[in-house]
């Protein structure tokens, strides 16, 4: 790839050979493969029957789902071997701050059930839509969503915040590391080219 070729030519480009962090959801599969039993396996025993009509209308039964899972698992292993880190972006690309506690728990359980076995798990969660679990002061000790995600093994929490160049926060009990990130996506690149942002 372009990045791997560049790093090979410039080994001082990254610290200890580190690459980037790729955050994946799960509801639509991973790495281009339809790996979600919930949506693509009509024999899924944990499918929520209230969504059956929507599922029939929007998705198809993936008869190759096990082969797709194996291929996605190979990609994750190869990326990690090269130095990439894989993070959770939530299973359903949810609004984590405004979602109910129950929804956050269900979504986290689904990521653990459908994605973690393919990517090997992670301790990083990158929130969708720039939302966060709490205000800038830090995660409150009684924040149920934080406590649940912490129980799931997450130690690193990242939102989207380009209000300043960078910022980090370490929990009062050193129980989490929180940081802002800049979304390097098509929208951000377009805004930079059009001089709307830095």
Where are these regions (language model features)?
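Metal-dependent polysaccharide deacetylase catalytic core of the NodB/CE4 family, i.e.
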Residues: 1-134, 163
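C-terminal active-site subregion of NodB/CE4 polysaccharide deacetylases
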Residues: 97-198
